C-alpha cells in the first residue's frame, strides 16, 4: 500500500483505511473510515495531506459526511487533523478521552510538547486547528458510541499516553489499537516498539496489550499501520519486546553513564525499516530511546 491509497479492511464490510503519507513514508500512518448509519473517522493523521484525506472519506462514504471523529489519543499523529475535520464537516462531533479534550480545544501545549519530542520531524507537521469546545465531548472507560448499526466500546489504555483509548467495534469485532499494541509493519509482519516521551509507561503498556488479548477480536486495526488478523502470539511477542527494549536501554545507561550517548548508540544501530526509509527509522529510534529513558527516570531501578 502506498501513501494516498484507500482500501477496504479485508474481511469486513463498510470499513476502510487510508495511508496518510505521514512523514513522507508509506505504510506508517492510518486513518480508518467506518461506513455506518452514523459514519465515523477513527484517528485523523497530523493534518498534512488533509485534502487527500477528505477525498478518501468522501469516497468511502459515497459523499456522506461523518457523524463522529474519534482520535484514539491526543498525540498529533493521531489527533492533528481533528480540528480540520471539524471544520470540513460542521455536523460532526469529536469524541476523545476526557484528558485529551483540553489539548484538542487549545493545542498550544500539545504543539510545544510535540516539537520537543519529535525534533527535526516537526517539518512534516502543520499547526493543528483547534476543535471548538461545543463540538467535542470527553470519553471515559466503559463508554459506548452508538453508530446506529454498530456499537463501539471505549477502553482506557494509558500506557502509551494517559489520554489514550482503544475502540472495540463489537459488530465487526475489530479493535482499533491506537498505539497500545505497538507499530505494526505489514511488510515484515512484525510489531515494533513505540515508547515516546514523556508519559510512556512500560508496565502499563503490557497491561494494555493484555486488555486487547482479553477482548480476543477478529481483527486489529493499528494506528501504525493497517489491519491484521488478531494473533495472541504476536501480542505476546510484543509484550516481550517491550520488556527487552526497556532492559536494553537500562543496561546501556549503566554502561555509558550518559543519556545522550545512549540515545546516539541506539540511533547509530537502528534497524532500518525499508518502507519508512533511513531518516524515519532513525528518528523513531531516537524518540523511543528518549521515552524509555524518561520511564526509567520515573520508576528508577525497579523497571
Give a label for each model feature.
Residues 14, 34, 43, 53, ...:
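Divalent metal-coordination and catalytic microenvironments
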Residues 50-97:
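Active-site metal-binding motif and surrounding structural segment of the metallo-beta-lactamase
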Amino acid at each position: 500500500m502506498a501513501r494516498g491509497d484507500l482500501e477496504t479492511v479485508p474481511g469486513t464490510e463498510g470499513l476502510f483505511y487510508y495511508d496518510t503519507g505521514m512523514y513522507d513514508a508509506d505504510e506508517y500512518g492510518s486513518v480508518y473510515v467506518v461506513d455506518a448509519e452514523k459514519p465515523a473517522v477513527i484517528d485523523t493523521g497530523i493534518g498534512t495531506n488533509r485534502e487527500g484525506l477528505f477525498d478518501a472519506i468522501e469516497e468511502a462514504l459515497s459523499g456522506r459526511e461523518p457523524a463522529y471523529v474519534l482520535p484514539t489519543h491526543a498525540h498529533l499523529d493521531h489527533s492533528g487533523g481533528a480540528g480540520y475535520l471539524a471544520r470540513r464537516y460542521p455536523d460532526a462531533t469529536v469524541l476523545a478521552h476526557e484528558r485529551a479534550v483540553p489539548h484538542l480545544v487549545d493545542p498550544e501545549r500539545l504543539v510545544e510538547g510535540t516539537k520537543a519530542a519529535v525534533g527535526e520531524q516537526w517539518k512534516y507537521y502543520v499547526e493543528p486547528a483547534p476543535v471548538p469546545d461545543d463540538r467535542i465531548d470527553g470519553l471515559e472507560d466503559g463508554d459506548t458510541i452508538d453508530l446506529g448499526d454498530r456499537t463501539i466500546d471505549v477502553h482506557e489504555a494509558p500506557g502509551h499516553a494517559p489520554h489514550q483509548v482503544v475502540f472495540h467495534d463489537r459488530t465487526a469485532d475489530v479493535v482499533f489499537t491506537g498505539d497500545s499494541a505497538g507499530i505494526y509493519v505489514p511488510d515484515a509482519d512484525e510489531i515494533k516498539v513505540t515508547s515516546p516521551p514523556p508519559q510512556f509507561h512500560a508496565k502499563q503498556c503490557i497491561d494494555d496489550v493484555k486488555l486487547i488479548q482479553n477482548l480476543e477480536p477478529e481483527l486489529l486495526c493499528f494506528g501504525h499501520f493497517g489491519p491484521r488478523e488478531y494473533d495472541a502470539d504476536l501480542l505476546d511477542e510484543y509484550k516481550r519486546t517491550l520488556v527487552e527494549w526497556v532492559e536494553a536501554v537500562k543496561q546501556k545507561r549503566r554502561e555509558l553513564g550518559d543519556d545522550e550517548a545512549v540515545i546516539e548508540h541506539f540511533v547509530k544501530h537502528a534497524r532500518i525499516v525499508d518502507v519508512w526509509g533511513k531518516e524515519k527509522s532513525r528518528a523513531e529510534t531516537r524518540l523511543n530511546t528518549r521515552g524509555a529513558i524518561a520511564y526509567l527516570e520515573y520508576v528508577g531501578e525497579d523497571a
